[in-house]
Amino acid sequence: MTRIKRGYIARRRRTKIRLFASSFRGAHSRLTRTMTQQRIRALVSAHRDRGRRKRDFRRLWITRINAVIQEMEVFNSYNRFIHNLYKKQLLLNRKILAQIALLNRSCLYTISNEIIK
């Protein structure tokens, strides 16, 4: 009985995984089983951290806005500032407000004065 060579499908799957794991260190980029395990773990971490990144940036923006507001002493808290912002129907999101707070504090001061009026 002649020897039958295996097909290319499994090899193609492994090379695809190997390309994904080529930047990993040690056995994680060399051994097939650990490569597949690390690939799954990397994808799980990426999926989890996409949601976490959104939360982290929102927290950073809120912290920056709060710091500048308390320094200006127009409002004594962040939540009063945001509440009055919504009451006056000034639609500025936290990302834009944080950029204004960092780059142009006088503009944020005029915004807060508009809210008070």
From Swiss-Prot:
Its main location: plastid. GO terms for biological process: ribosomal large subunit assembly; translation. Belongs to the bacterial ribosomal protein bL20 family. Keywords: Chloroplast, Plastid, Ribonucleoprotein, Ribosomal protein, RNA-binding, rRNA-binding. This is Large ribosomal subunit protein bL20c. Binds directly to 23S ribosomal RNA and is necessary for the in vitro assembly process of the 50S ribosomal subunit. It is not involved in the protein synthesizing functions of that subunit. It comes from Aethionema cordifolium (Lebanon stonecress). GO terms for cellular component: chloroplast; ribonucleoprotein complex; ribosome. Disulfide bonds: none annotated. Signal peptide: none annotated.
